[in-house]
């Protein structure tokens, strides 16, 4: 299962808690076509409706992610001005 962000991690945990690890692993093998094994695709295979609470990222996690992105952008801006 591919988990790229906090929402994916919450969704994966909920799927495993709700359906069990074996059912989730089996559903991963039934993903059709070229779709990747993201938790949302596995949920579709299981016919699961995800709770609204899983869809929202908590403010603290969102702020932390934004701060990391700002640091990354600031680092690139410094490199670019040094290259001139």
UniProtKB/Swiss-Prot annotation:
Specify the domain of life of the species encoding this protein: Bacteria
- UniProt keyword annotations, A-Z: Plasmid
What's in the misc comment field?
Answer: Plasmid pJD1 is the smallest of the gonococcal plasmids. Its function is unknown.
- Protein's recorded name: Cryptic plasmid protein A
